[in-house]
Amino acid sequence: MITGATAGIGRATAHVLAQDGHHLILTGRRRERLEALRDELARTYPKSRFLTLTFDVRRRESVEEAIASLPDEWQAIDTLINNAGLAVGLESIHEGDPDDWERMIDTNIKGLLYVTRAVTPGMVARRAGHIVNLGSIAGREVYPGGAVYCATKHAVRALSQGMRQDLLPYGIRVSLICPGAVETEFSIVRFKGDNQRAASVYDSYTPLSADDIARTIRFALTAPAHVDLQDILVMPTAQADARTIHRTPKG
């Protein structure tokens, strides 16, 4: 199961795992985009099967109802990729919009918890499973204007550690993937559709691609059963930390 499957890292991960022959439950808020992705994957990877679930991870009842509605043959989820997440705004704490804060907290923390709570009882019963949480360099450092987003990703890191402790007796692995700068719709969402400002985030250096992170997720999933790649930090070569990027002007 991949949350936030319709764009960016989620979409790229769906392609990489389908290529490997996995059967995928694709989830997201946008039904049309989910169905288009499903159809595209089915044409490209005919040996894999695909199911879509439309829900907003922020709505606990919707999450629970959607996962409970899975047909019997799709109930045994062996891998959960908690990819849904976002940043909104880059204002100082005294200027930030509380609605933006709530959107980030509800998606990045509560949404991850709702989906995990709905899926993990089955893993526990089967005494097997793998959870992959999408963290961020922002879960290790804090940068100006990013206080709330960074706090949510610090929470994801703490939750990942707690999940490992709670699920350890059941043979369930928990991997945290922490990207640096990845060129996706992330900055367009953060800057509320300001494409020029979003593009400037990735100007004059080569950022990571969604496919880079998808392949990192594959790497974690394909480790031997006795190996848990618990915490992976993935950065562009041009990025040293959350605030230090070496930009080489063109020309």
PLM segments and residue spans:
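Residue(s) in the substrate-gating loop at a strand-loop-helix junction
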Residues: 136
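Substrate-binding pocket helix/loop in short-chain dehydrogenase/reductase
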Residues: 91-93, 100-102
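Conserved glycine-rich cofactor-binding loop
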Residues: 6-8
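C-terminal helical subdomain
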Residues: 176-180, 184, 196-243
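Active-site helix of classical SDR
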Residues: 116, 152
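The beta1-alpha1 cofactor-binding region of Rossmann-like NAD(H)/NADP(H)-dependent oxidoreductases
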Residues: 32, 54-65, 98
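Conserved glycine-rich Rossmann-like NAD(P)H-binding loop of the short-chain dehydrogenase/reductase
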Residues: 22-37
